[in-house]
């Protein structure tokens, strides 16, 4: 095979791989088209408890950390400002409207090590288990930037009732 032929085969293989990846993402966005992140502000009178800078990693199907959901507002990794209030958690992702998870929506908070393509040191991620408007159970993963994952998890656990804090939070 000539050098030009080898290059043509490599370009063709790369094009097929990119086409398959695009097709897979298109199918995933169609599957998750009905899922929406809860966009909105904290209720009036909510008191800020703590603020954190974090990397938003992903939202997945509950207890399936490798099954990303492609929902509007939470489909892509992003920098995030996390504001913990006495009424819930506000997520401000770069370029997206504010997402507010009220305490009644949050089922648990704990720490994790892996989500999608992110593997970190033991318990380096914060996993927030919550429910969408339609009742779908999901997990969202955050990687704190200026503090420990335990500090963020403890701050969130502090606003939840005891049965909401997860197994190790």
Name each region found by the language model.
Residues 1-41:
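N-terminal signal-anchor transmembrane alpha helix of single-pass membrane proteins
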Residues 24-82:
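Anionic N-terminal interaction surfaces
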Residues 27, 109-169:
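Acidic, Ser/Thr- and proline-rich intrinsically disordered linker/docking segments
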Residues 66, 73-74, 92, 97-99, ...:
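Cytosolic/nucleoplasmic/matrix-facing N-terminal domains/tails
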Residues 77, 83-84, 127, 134:
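Short leucine-rich amphipathic alpha-helices used at interfaces
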Residues 80-116:
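Phosphoinositide-binding peripheral membrane targeting modules
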């Amino acid at each position: 095979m000539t050098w030009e032929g080898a290059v043509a085969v490599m370009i063709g293989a790369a094009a097929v791989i990119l086409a398959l990846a695009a097709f897979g993402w298109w199918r995933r966005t169609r599957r998750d088209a009905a899922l929406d992140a809860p966009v909105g502000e904290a209720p009036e009178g909510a008191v800020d408890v703590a603020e954190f800078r974090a990397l938003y990693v992903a939202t997945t199907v509950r207890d399936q950390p490798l099954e990303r959901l492609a929902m509007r507002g939470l489909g892509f990794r992003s920098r995030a400002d996390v504001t913990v209030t006495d009424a819930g958690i506000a997520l401000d992702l770069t370029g997206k409207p504010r997402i507010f998870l009220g305490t009644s929506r949050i089922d648990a908070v704990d720490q994790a090590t892996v989500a999608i393509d992110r593997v970190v040191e033991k318990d380096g991620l914060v996993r927030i288990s919550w429910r969408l408007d339609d009742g779908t159970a999901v997990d969202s993963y955050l990687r704190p930037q200026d503090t420990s994952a335990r500090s963020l998890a403890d701050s969130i656990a502090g606003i939840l009732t005891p049965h909401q804090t997860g197994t190790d939070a």
